[in-house]
Regions:
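Extreme N-terminal starter segment of soluble prokaryotic enzymes
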Residues: 1-5
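Glycine-rich phosphate/diphosphate-binding loop of Rossmann-like nucleotide-binding domains
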Residues: 6-23, 28-29, 151-221, 233
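Buried hydrophobic positions in well-ordered alpha/beta secondary-structure cores of metabolic enzymes
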Residues: 11-14, 67, 134, 173, ...
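Buried hydrophobic packing segments
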Residues: 21, 25, 203, 295-306, ...
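N-terminal beta-loop-helix "entrance" segment that forms/cooperates
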Residues: 33-57, 225-227
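Glycine-rich phosphate/nucleotide-binding loop
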Residues: 45-48, 227-328
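N-terminal glycine-rich phosphate/adenylate-binding segment common to multiple enzyme folds
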Residues: 49-156, 242-244
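Glycine-rich phosphate/pyrophosphate-binding loop and the adjoining helix
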Residues: 138-139, 143-180, 184-186, 190-192, ...
Length: 356
């Protein structure tokens, strides 16, 4: 297979972790006979420094012409004084909008080798945990109308969803549940919010098309509690932008380290945007100590969802597991008795296991 992948290293540790993810994808291409080309572009602060804007039209066009986009991280204190409309994070929002992605996938798994890093009691994670949180990206209160009174003493943010917005996300959720363990939990606040009542009604109607999927409903406050008390009960969780933002970060804490967590943003085509969920970590940038595994695992989502290469994705996941089995750890997941390695060495280790 030939594939064109745009890389957006971004800021601070972004270039370091992207380099390792590309290294591993190149190992996959070598082993399985694929031809991956990588087109590196600037995003966020790096783009501001070079072009004066966080995302150029040329970069967006390149992303939309690619088979997939792999991103590092954007933002940091260097650009704190930049006017809000040109901040690095605005580049990411514009990229998501320009690529027309609307579904954010956040896997939550606990690697057995890192169970000690999970803050939950051992009995709460005794069963395998494999959750996929599906968050809507383009609607909800983040994109609703905003108002602030002239005296700055009152403010309003509008929460809004339409049936088509919920339907297109739900379709992805149901199809994903069919391929996984056949369970979908829809999270809302339908006892209070009209927006959530529309959400639940839409999920209920669509569930009739998927009789093989077991559907459940939870209010968001209960879902937040159940993620702690019994995370193994969940398979696919589907929710809106605001609730998903909060729950997906909670799930990252369960996994033990932000550095291990990948994500994908998908639309109605196979082209997707893939990135780790952690930030740009300016405090450790340039020291070759960042954890690249979240970015490397984002590459598995890229292979699986954009290129349809399931065996290749599984090969990377197996390689990561082997490296962890052998005791190698970056500083954020290090514990006594393990072998501490840097960002580059971790990438080398995973790539070598892919090729073996």
């Amino acid at each position: 297979m030939k594939a064109n992948i745009v890389t957006l290293p971004g800021d601070y540790i972004g270039p370091e972790i992207i380099t390792q993810a590309v290294k591993v994808l190149q190992a996959v291409a070598e082993k399985y006979g694929h031809e991956f080309s990588f087109d590196e572009r600037k995003l966020g602060g790096a783009s501001i420094d070079a072009f004066g804007v966080p995302l150029t039209d040329e970069t967006l066009a390149a992303c939309n012409a690619a088979d997939a986009v792999l991103m590092g991280s954007v933002g940091g204190p260097k650009w704190d004084a930049v006017e809000p409309a040109r901040r690095p994070e605005k580049g990411l929002l514009a990229l998501r909008k320009g690529m027309q992605v609307f579904a954010n996938l956040r896997p939550c798994t606990i690697h057995p080798q890192l169970a000690g890093a999970c803050p939950l009691r051992p009995d709460l994670i005794s069963k395998p945990i494999d959750i996929m949180i599906l968050r809507e990206l383009t609607g909800d209160i983040y994109f609703g109308k905003r108002w602030r009174s002239e005296d700055r003493a009152a403010a309003t943010d509008e929460m809004a969803y339409s049936v088509p917005e919920v339907e297109r996300l739900a379709r992805i959720g149901f199809e994903m549940a069919k391929k996984r363990r056949g369970k979908l939990c829809s999270v809302d606040k339908a006892n209070v919010l009209e927006c959530s009542r529309l959400w639940r009604e839409t999920i209920e109607r669509m569930s009739r098309e998927y009789p093989e999927v077991e559907v459940s409903y939870m209010y968001v406050d209960n879902a937040a509690m159940q993620l702690i008390l019994n995370p193994a009960q969940f398979d696919v969780m589907i929710t809106g932008n605001l609730f998903g933002d909060i729950l997906s970060d909670e799930s990252a804490a369960i996994a033990g380290s932000l550095g291990m967590m990948p994500s994908a943003s998908l639309g109605s085509t196979t082209r997707g945007l893939y990135e780790p969920i952690h930030g740009s970590a300016p405090d450790i940038a340039g020291r070759d100590i960042a954890n690249p595994l979240g970015t490397i695992l984002s590459g598995t989502l890229l292979l699986r969802h954009s290129l349809g290469l399931e065996a290749e994705a599984a090969a990377i996941e197996k390689a990561v597991s082997q490296v962890l089995d052998e005791g190698y750890r970056t500083g954020d997941i290090f514990s006594e008795g393990c072998i501490k390695v840097g960002c580059t060495q971790m990438g080398d280790l995973v790539a070598k296991r892919v090729l073996s």
